């Protein structure tokens, strides 16, 4: 039975049982910061379970797309190595919010699995687990379903910790929870059927878990205390791919109809003969291209944080496995096309076909970046290997390659294994783990104010005013609540109402003063933590007390320049959409009083001509003095109006819309002018590609533009004085200088090459012939690295069967090059020659079969030592015919 049919049957079954069929929700959870991705069918109903949302429908069934790549549900490392794990999967589920409970949930599951009309699975092959003190569930299975007692397994708490069991499900440390009953199906082939399964270990060995029924009947209010919920709920989950394994009678999810088609299509596309040992890599690539394609279709881009980092991790893991099977050029991006057909009959539309061009571009760019990192990282690894002793590499150095240069650990392992070099993987994992802890602690210190006990929320009232009479409701000094701040003390002040804008929407927070007749507090920055506006600064004069009535005054001049930059950012966003036929995706912005920075995703490049056009559009809108208005509405309504907003940002129910008439409309809670004319003027000062088709524009407005041109004018005048001409002629003069310089460099290279040819003639005349092999060993001076190689190549062209050793003295840095002609590479071992040299002059170096390069650990080389090396090498080469 094919996967599509199983899904359709499941939904039809529950439709007949009066369940409302819901579509799969997005892979990106809505209004839930606790999850990176949707990882279970119940995610979209979480608020109903938590009683934060009214239930319109009592019984629901879904087929939900899920991703499990981290945290409690981290399937990423298992993918390809086990038969049943993958990162993107479908979870079939039925849910009830008070309409039915344990008995019906169990009856429905049993009927769907075993009835002839539905899946018709063998009852003899089904085993059940239940929570040890859930006697109600036990009775239902034994007395109503009539399952054999030998097929019912009691699961206890782990380590005698109450409710810590595989059969007791929790939403979190606290909150809704309850016992569960799991359904397993006997899956071992080519063996006599095991008559009795008595433990969970045996279950996992012989059976496959196919369905988990969770009975949400408790609320955990402390670590040890749970109470009954007023209305119990049902939450069940059955992996579509897992049940497909059973119904299609195959070994693993990678042999089910959807995956087998994809894997075969991948084999054709990559045009590489896949060996049996590489099947794991092929499975990983097939899983990861599905997940990567769907995530990019959901507007997630590869990056270094959160969801973006997970996507990058998935892509790079697939690329590593591509590298292992011999794919050393971009290939992954081509595979995304296969997903269009592979996921055609999905129950959720990712719009892959419409977005395929964008998806391929993003994947291609990520691959190019990966191969650059790989090449650079491997070069650094080779250098490290050159200097190691006893074929053992330091774990800290491998960590640096991974953490600083991005070289994947798997590739380092493979490379070192080939070279018979070892390192302690457990020690390396410990270094990685400790580093992650350090980074987390740093981030907490930077971003988190959770160490402070906050009292009352503060209100922002500063969109149209610059000062406000306020009351101090809280003072924090050295992370503690205090009654007052005195002169020079650094601290945080919270007001009941404030005109200070806190850092948000890419805009920096306000600075200014909080003062009364007793003292002055200088506000250096304003931040927001939850609903508290924190004025961070120091006492300049006198003191400030709790409950004081104060005047809160923002830096008006600074605010106005920030407003200019923020309103200009909206004009820039709209102008970019006008220039490019395809829509751009805003990825972020930074706005202060000096400049604005705008990051956006776009497949196309901004030429110089387009940048000028962009500036003209924006400056014309500024000159027209267009009103800038705002309106408060619900996020739901705003989405229906197709208003621009950041795809990855979490918005509140109520949002603020900024309108620039007939040109721009965006969600934004930043501060703006009331008309475009107040921006003054606009100038782009930088444009670059910051990665993965993400472009960055840096621009200035108002007085900063005037200052920018004043500075340019000063430079122009200096150039005019220097060249005794006007600015219009300077470009031609500079061009002539550059061209002359190029010619001089070319002439210099010609002279150096001529010199190398002359040196080669002298060295050939000194070549020593021994045992039908030529040996040149000479000391040279001040020859560049590239030219030393060239000299070696010239010598090898002129003399067949040549061993050349060049010792180059280059201002206290003495390096060497050992090389042989190709016909000697299977006769003469260069490492042996290197060791002979090192026995006379200590040094380090390494390379290939035909060339070794390195350096000596001394400042000066005497000729008698070169003679000594020569004698030893002649003795060595005379051994070989």
UniProtKB/Swiss-Prot annotation:
The keyword ATP-binding applies. Gene3D superfamilies: 2.40.30.130, 3.10.310.40, Bira Bifunctional Protein, Domain 2, Threonyl-trna Synthetase, Chain A, domain 2. GO terms for biological process: alanyl-tRNA aminoacylation. It is found in: Cytoplasm. Its cofactor is Zn(2+). Keywords: Aminoacyl-tRNA synthetase, ATP-binding, Cytoplasm, Ligase, Metal-binding, Nucleotide-binding, Protein biosynthesis, RNA-binding, tRNA-binding, Zinc. Homotetramer. This is Alanine--tRNA ligase. It comes from Buchnera aphidicola subsp. Cinara cedri (strain Cc). The gene is alaS.
